[in-house]
Amino acid sequence: NDIDILVNNVGIFRGKEFKDETIEDWNDHFKVNLMSGVQLSKHFLPEMIKRDWGRIIFISSECATLVPSDLLSYSVSKASINVFSSGLAKLTKGTNVTVNTIVPGSTLSEGSKKFLEETALRENKTKDEVEENFFNDVRDSSLISRFLTVAEVANTILYYSSPLASGTNGASVRVDGGSMGSII
């Protein structure tokens, strides 16, 4: 149980219109995206509190706020992570344990690369054209108008895992290229 840093980064998503989503889709999104982190936190948080040091970090998504109509169950599961993390942080009051959520924007992950390739093939376009269309049509609020790199998100996680971030607890930290448009 000597875990100092827990990063809850597992996640699945299935893009379907609401009318096509099954209860199984909803259950799967919550089981993997939320409940895996709940179970791991339940297991490791008591020991972190006992040792008076630890970091629990959840990875959410901009979809928790910018909800696409074809990702409802995914988006709701990610919004639940934000709420759970905020509440869990309250249990660490007076300790050197922190619980925070990283909220990345559209990131060029393996899943995003596959999406770009499949869409390019289906629409007879280049991956660059598909990406440009995505940021013009779907995520036009992005101020950087590109996918975040995995390294950009990982560097944020590294910071919030470190003692340097000891003053931040219970936060949802955006790494979204400005896509959410909030000043807070």
Each model region followed by its residue ranges:
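Active-site loop-to-helix junction immediately N-terminal to the catalytic Tyr of the SDR YXXXK motif
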Residues: E21, V67-S75, G87
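C-terminal substrate-recognition "lid" of short-chain dehydrogenase/reductases
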Residues: V38, W53, S142-V175, M180
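Alpha-helical segment proximal to the catalytic Tyr-Lys
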Residues: P46, K90-L91, S166
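Short, small/polar-rich loop/turn modules that mediate ligand/substrate recognition or access, typified
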Residues: K93, T98, T168-G170
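Residue(s) in the substrate-gating loop at a strand-loop-helix junction
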Residues: S61
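Substrate-binding pocket helix/loop in short-chain dehydrogenase/reductase
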Residues: E17-F18, D25-F30, V138
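Active-site helix of classical SDR
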Residues: S41, S77
